Amino acid sequence: MDNHRRTKQPKTNSIVTSSSEEVSSLEWEVVNMSQEEEDLVSRMHKLVGDRWELIAGRIPGRTAGEIERFWVMKN
């Protein structure tokens, strides 16, 4: 039984760690995009859904995180 507790403890810690690393929406910075970028994000989202890496690949200089943050804050 002691081995079971030892192996279970790190899993609990990793869950706590990952949830404590979540970013509150209040801490997000506003992402300003040009009208062209907004249109492209909207069209790409209709085609591929929440595949932010794929969408970011079509918009030079934008990261997947920026695009997702823009989408979440806009919608």
Swiss-Prot record:
Myb-like domain location: 34-71
InterPro entries attached to this UniProt entry: Homeodomain-like_sf (IPR009057), Myb_TF_plants (IPR015495), SANT/Myb (IPR001005)
Tissue distribution of the protein: Expressed in leaf epidermal cells, stomate guard cells in leaves, cotyledons and hypocotyls, inflorescences, developing seeds and siliques.
Region of interest (Disordered), ranges: 1-20
Disruption-associated phenotype: Increased number or trichomes and reduced number of root hairs.
A GO molecular function held by the record: DNA binding
Gene: ETC3
Keywords (A to Z) from UniProt: Developmental protein, DNA-binding, Nucleus, Transcription, Transcription regulation
PROSITE patterns in alphabetical order: MYB_LIKE
Keyword Oxidoreductase: no
Chief location category: nucleus
Subcellular location: Nucleus
Job of this protein: MYB-type transcription factor involved in epidermal cell fate specification. Acts as a negative regulator of trichome development, including endoreplication, by mediating lateral inhibition. Promotes the formation of hair developing cells in H position in root epidermis, probably by inhibiting non-hair cell formation. May have pleiotropic effects on flowering development and epidermal cell size through the regulation of endoreduplication.
Name under which the protein is recorded: MYB-like transcription factor ETC3
